[in-house]
A protein has these predicted regions:
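Conserved class I S-adenosyl-L-methionine
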Residues: 113-124
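Helix-to-beta-strand junctions that scaffold the AdoMet/dcAdoMet cofactor pocket
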Residues: 137, 232-234
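Class I S-adenosyl-L-methionine
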Residues: 184, 237-240, 245-349
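Polybasic, low-complexity RNA-engagement segments
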Residues: 1-42, 54-59, 296, 303-456
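A short acidic, Gly/Pro-enriched loop at the edge of an enzyme's catalytic core
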Residues: 113-114, 176-188
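Conserved SAM-binding loop of SAM-dependent methyltransferases across substrates and taxa
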Residues: 125-138
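Mobile active-site "lid"/loop adjacent to the S-adenosyl-L-methionine
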Residues: 150, 185-227, 243-251, 269-272
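S-adenosyl-L-methionine
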Residues: 145-182
C-alpha cells in the first residue's frame, strides 16, 4: 500500500506508532465488521437467522464482544445487512468498533442515570447519536445535529428507526448553538477531519489526504469547537473525537482547548489489554493494536461560565385538544407524553421536555422531534412510519406477521401475497418487530413503506 507523501513521516514521533506494524495492518486485507445492538428493541438471539453471509449459511457467522461497548459485537464476516429485515426494524446499527469507545467516555465522565441535556454536534449518519440515545436515561434529551441539509435527513431516518422519543434532529451550524448559552450538560463533537484513520477501510481517502488539508481541518476543528463551547454549561463535559492520526487534529487540538479555553482534561480508566494508547490528553486507536480502525478521543470539563441557561422561548405548537387525543389514543401509549399539533400533523413529545422542545423550535432549525404520530384527515389518524418504528406505540395495534421472503418484498415495495383477517391499518411485522404499515382493503392491501427507504 502506497501511503501519501509525508504521511508516515508525520506519525514517527506519535505515541504508539510502529511503522512496520502500521503498514502491515494496512496490507493484511483484514476487514473488521462490527454492530451495536439496540436495547430498545432487544433480540432473543444474535445473529438472527435472517442475517446471512452471501453464499453461506447462518452457522458460518460468529460474533465476539467489543470490550469497551456492552452492546457491541464483532462479526466474523460481513453479511448482507441490506436483506435482513431486522436491520430495517432498527434492532442494530452497523458501526465501526473503535468509535464505540464513546460509551466509556460517557460512563466515566458523567452520571448517565441522571437527566442530561446532550448535544451531538456533527451527528450524521447517526452512529454516535443512536449510541448516545441508548446510553442516556429516558429522562434525558438528545439534540442530534448535522450542518449539511441532505445528511440531516439521513440522520433523521436513522433516529426514527432507532425508536426513541427523546431526540430532536437539527440542521444548524455550530455557531447557532450560542443561542443556547450554558444549556448542555454534554457536547459530543466528532469533528470533520482529514480521514486518515479510515485508510484501510477506504483506500480512496488517501487521494484526498495532504499536509495542507490536515492544517485546514485543524483550523476548521478549532472554529467548530470555539463556536459550540458557549452552549456547554460550567461543569459540563466535552467529548472530542476524530478519525484522523494527525497530531494537528488530535493532541494539538487538546492542547489548544486547555490553553485557550481553560478546558480541564478528564482522564479515563482504560485496561491495558484493550490496546488503546493514552497520548497527551486523549486516547489513540491504532489498527495494529486494536480490532478496529484509526480513532482518537479526548474528554474535557468546562470550568468557566454559568451552570444554567437563562433564555426564554417564544415559538409554541398547539396542544392537541380532546377530539385529537381521542383520535390518537388507540395508536400510542400517551403516559408521559404530550401531544402537539403542527398544521395537521400530530407529534408526541416527552412531557418533561415540552418547554425545551419549544425552545429548540425557537432557536434552531429543527428537522424532526419526538415521535411523528401521523396526520389527521377528517378527524381520523393516518399513522406515520415513525410511529411504527417507535417504542411508544399502543400494545393492541393490529399487525400482520410476515415471513422472510414477504418481509423483503415489503421492504422492496414489490407485490406479494398475504393472508389478512381484519381490514384497516396494520403493522407489517417480522419476527415480532414492526417494519412499517399496510392498509388492508376488501380485495387487497396497500404497502405504506416509505418510497425513499425501499431497498433495491
Amino acid at each position: 500500500m502506497n501511503f501519501p507523501p509525508g504521511f508516515l513521516e508525520q506519525l514517527t514521533s506519535t505515541a504508539g506508532f510502529s511503522k512496520d506494524a502500521f503498514a502491515a495492518a494496512h496490507t493484511s486485507g483484514l476487514s473488521v465488521t462490527s454492530v451495536r445492538l439496540n436495547p430498545l428493541k432487544p433480540l432473543p438471539v444474535f445473529p438472527p437467522s435472517s442475517l446471512k453471509i452471501s453464499g453461506g449459511i447462518l452457522s458460518d457467522l460468529t460474533i465476539s464482544p467489543i470490550p469497551w461497548c456492552d452492546t457491541g459485537y464483532y462479526l466474523s464476516e460481513r453479511p448482507s445487512f441490506t436483506f435482513d429485515p431486522l436491520f430495517h426494524a432498527g434492532t442494530y446499527y452497523v458501526q465501526e468498533a473503535s468509535s464505540m469507545f464513546l460509551e466509556q467516555a460517557m460512563k466515566q465522565s458523567v452520571d448517565i442515570s441522571a437527566p442530561l441535556k446532550v448535544l451531538d454536534l456533527c451527528a450524521a449518519p447517526g452512529g454516535k447519536s443512536t449510541h448516545l440515545q441508548s446510553l442516556i436515561s429516558k429522562e434525558s434529551v438528545l439534540v442530534s445535529n448535522e450542518v449539511i441539509r441532505a445528511r440531516s435527513f439521513i440522520l433523521r431516518d436513522n433516529i426514527i428507526k432507532w425508536g426513541g422519543d427523546n431526540v430532536v434532529v437539527a440542521n444548524n451550524d455550530p455557531k447557532d448553538f450560542a443561542r443556547l448559552e450554558h444549556y448542555f450538560d454534554v457536547v459530543v463533537a466528532d469533528a470533520p477531519c482529514s480521514g486518515s484513520g479510515l485508510f484501510r477501510k477506504e483506500p480512496e481517502a488517501m487521494e484526498e489526504w495532504s499536509e495542507n488539508n490536515v492544517q485546514l481541518c485543524s483550523q476548521r476543528q478549532q472554529r467548530i469547537l470555539a463556536d459550540v463551547l458557549p452552549a456547554l454549561k460550567n461543569g459540563g463535559i466535552l467529548i472530542y473525537s476524530t478519525c484522523s492520526y494527525s497530531k494537528e487534529e488530535d493532541e494539538e487540538i487538546c492542547h489548544w482547548l486547555s490553553a485557550e479555553h481553560g478546558m480541564q482534561p478528564v482522564q479515563l480508566s482504560v485496561p491495558m489489554e484493550w490496546g488503546i494508547i493514552e497520548s497527551g490528553d486523549g486516547y489513540r486507536f491504532w489498527p495494529d493494536r486494536v480490532k478496529g480502525e484509526g480513532f482518537f478521543l479526548a474528554c474535557f470539563q468546562k470550568t468557566v461560565g454559568q451552570e444554567k441557561y437563562h433564555g426564554k422561548t417564544a415559538k409554541q405548537l398547539s396542544h392537541a385538544g380532546q377530539q385529537i387525543r381521542a383520535a390518537v389514543k388507540p395508536w400510542i401509549a400517551t403516559e408521559g407524553k404530550q401531544l402537539l399539533l403542527h398544521e395537521s400533523t400530530v407529534y408526541a413529545w416527552p412531557e418533561k421536555w415540552v418547554e425545551d422542545f419549544h425552545l429548540f423550535l425557537d432557536k434552531l432549525r429543527v428537522v424532526y422531534s419526538g415521535v411523528r404520530v401521523g396526520e389527521l384527515i377528517r378527524e381520523k389518524l393516518i399513522p406515520d412510519h415513525a410511529l411504527a418504528m417507535s417504542t411508544c406505540m399502543a400494545n393492541d395495534v393490529l399487525s400482520s406477521a410476515l415471513q422472510l421472503d414477504q418481509a423483503i418484498a415489503y421492504l422492496q415495495k414489490k407485490e406479494f401475497s398475504l393472508e389478512t383477517g381484519q381490514k384497516g391499518w396494520q403493522l407489517a411485522v417480522y419476527d415480532q418487530l414492526p417494519l412499517g404499515w399496510i392498509n388492508v382493503l376488501p380485495n387487497r392491501f396497500n404497502n405504506y413503506y416509505p418510497k425513499e427507504l425501499r431497498i433495491l
